[in-house]
Amino acid sequence: MAQECWNKINIPFPSAVSSTRIPFTGSIDLLIDCLLADCEKVLTLLCSEVLQTEIRVLYELLYILNNGFRQHKPFRALKQVEQCVNRLKEMKLQAAVEDLKEVCPNKFQREAGAEAGECDVPSQPMLEWLGLKLLGASSLLARTLERCTKTFLLTRQHLRLGEFIVLNVVITSMLSRLWVFFRGILRALIPMYRRNCELLQKVSQSQPMAYLTDFTLPEDLKDFLCLTYPDLKIEEVTKDLLKGTRGKRKSKFSLLSKLFGDTEQQEEIGEGERDLMPILSAGHYEVSSLDLGAAVSQRRTDYSDVSPYGLGIKAMLQQSSKTTKQKSLEQQMKLDSSSKASLCQKRTSLKKTSSFRNMAALLKELMNWCRSCKFYQEHKRLAFLSLKCGRMESLEAEGVRVEKRLKTFKIKVQKALTLQQTFPPKHSCSLPALLRTRWQNKFFMRHFRTLRRRSAVSRKSSGTVKGSLNQRRKCRPLLQSSNEVESGENVTASVEIEKMDSQTSLQEPNIPKDDIDDIFESFGF
């Protein structure tokens, strides 16, 4: 088989018997009893109604947010959590644990086997196949825990910004419950795997039937997971640990406190809580002499400023708001100074580049830096220039001389790095931006005025031409009916026609005075 035969959703079941008869002793009896108890723990966690409800909530959230939050980073991380949950269902861990529970002898069978000296137990192929299943399920659960923490961190960022508060609160609560359940299943699988390996050794000594030939199962599941997930810290729940934690309070911080604050803030909060505990718990152990049925009038000072325990709430809140504002301003100043220094370094390295091959590597570094600093415009411009750089790199490899192109390309990269300085935002009130907008408005107004003048002139010329043609059409019938009208009237009409023709000739000198027939004769028709 392959080296990572456990890293499969469907591991083929061995075509061999599921149980064998071996000599039965007290150690095997105790081992099978512990293995059945571990199986019961895993099954109760997997079949929990709370877990199934949280998974259904996850599916419903993804169904609702599919259209509006497709480019949302927490939504993408939630999709990865859903993929892990679906793979955990598809690998059928619950069915495998139930099969092992059925194959293992129950209490009465173990008692009969102890009397007879022999008993039926799971065979070596069955135990090896179950070991592969447990390895795959544990690695998948560790991956699910990692995805849950990443999604939790992303939603925490949006909560700090005050975006989608109700949605992010629902997501964080759901993820925290899923994280607790999957961590509990993983902690229950570790002792189960160890006892499975111990039983496998004893069965292989008496009835050897090797199913895995090219792969050996690791002895400890915790060491196997720490190789791929070094940050994963898993502690087994034992009776001694539970007894020790009953009387003592845990000094470690929970996952929420680790995710929501720095270590220095946690230490300060812890010291403050230790100082406040005697004040807050002072009245709990004193016996009150007040009658519960009688009205009590307690005199207190200003409710808004001082609490009943003597703490200045308003002063505390003002101090916390001031400290948070100061920290945010300091962080912004540090980021600005660091980005300017790194930008100067990038420019110096850009000047030193001597080939497009080095330029391509430098562009990748610049794109990663812009992405980390959230310079999205520069990142887009550099991504476009990287495509050009790839083409120039291929030409350079063919032997084409590209020294001049490299110089112009360096200038383009420098312009792309200073994109935010050259193009300020739309709502900026800087003097260069205002001058630029005024110049653009003046240019557009001039262009619009010239267009209006041209359109007015063209309308006037077209109107005069139409008027002259209409006047000619009206005057021609008068000339044709000159025989029917008196001579005096004909003379006056002809004089008027000559005046009108002279006026039209003055208005439009370019219009020809020939008839339509003369025009066609000039063309040769």
UniProtKB/Swiss-Prot annotation:
Matching InterPro entries: Nepro-associated, Nepro_N
Source species, domain of life: Eukaryota
Function recorded in the entry: May play a role in the Notch signaling pathway.
The name this protein goes by in its record: Nucleolus and neural progenitor protein
Record's keyword terms, sorted: Developmental protein, Nucleus
Family: Belongs to the nepro family.
Gene Ontology cellular-component terms listed: nucleolus; nucleus
Localization annotation: Nucleus; Nucleus, Nucleolus
Listed GO biological process terms: negative regulation of neuron differentiation; positive regulation of Notch signaling pathway
Broad class of the protein's primary localization: nucleus
Source organism of the structure: Danio rerio
One Pfam family hit: NEPRO_N
Region annotated Nuclear localization signal, chain positions: 435-453
